[in-house]
Amino acid sequence: MKQLFAAILCLCLLAGCGRTDSTGNTCRAEESSGDGDVPGKTEETGADAGGELFRIIRSQDGAAPLLLAKESGGPGDVYTLSPTTVEPTLDGRSTAAMDLVYTPGTLLEITYGSVLETYPGQLAEVTAVNIRSDGFDDRCALYLRVLNDLWAVDEGLNSDITMLSVDLSQTGLSDSEQAAVAWAFGGEHGISQVLSLNYEQLAAEGYLTGADPDSDGMPCWEDGCLFTITEQETGDNELNGARNTVTFDAQKWRSALGAYFFTDCTASRDAQGHWGDYTVGAAAIS
């Protein structure tokens, strides 16, 4: 009888060990959903998720909440960090006596326990925030300025849109940085439906009218506007954004007869990674 009882107990323990915890994965809303917060839902990231690197894309007057892009992340790796009771460190040293400013372009090393299921995802259960003095690069802030300048010129092209697409695929930004810039740009102008598609993809997915080769009409996006930044290639066939000077073209497109262009734009960064103002070689309208 004792042997039978012991065998039953072992089977019960094995059954318990075989269960998979349903909170074992990081959850985030899909980029294309456009949904806001999904209250009350979190998923654990796992103990090994601590100390991950994120780049600040946008801050509110140098303070939290921060919009972050996970370093070398995918389109869904866009997050926010709200004020916490955790005292940040600077390269591992205390910042108690410092007047901290969170500057876009700065790298943060963040240890956290879970992510709220929203888009952008909200980092939660944060136990450590380490501000890195190395790796600074605020090219995302540069391209946000370019996009906002494009928005402001010939504003009739985008004054009545309900959606937009931002194509940064031909820049040196990571997928997560591209998605974060697009989301921030749309939010600044009250556009909740933000895509990251190029012209061909918009046409293929049916957003454009008159784009079919057999159509007699003129290509047009009736409800939206496409914003594109394209870095020019260097002689070795690499995008020159990886260097200290970048040359690029930028445009917004509503239709074949409704577009605005910045061409041969140039910008440079200093030794600390700060990108300065850019110059426009020429502007054109169609």
Task: Tell me the role of every PLM-derived stretch.
Residues 113-119:
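Short, charged beta-turn/beta-strand-edge "cap" motif at the junction between a beta-strand
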Residues 46-53, 259-263:
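Short coil-to-beta-strand transition motifs
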Residues 18, 24, 28-35, 40-44, ...:
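Flexible low-complexity loop/turn motifs enriched in small/helix-breaking residues
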Residues 13-16:
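C-terminal motif of bacterial Sec signal peptides marking the signal peptidase cleavage site
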Residues 262-286:
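Short beta-strand edge/turn micro-motifs at domain boundaries
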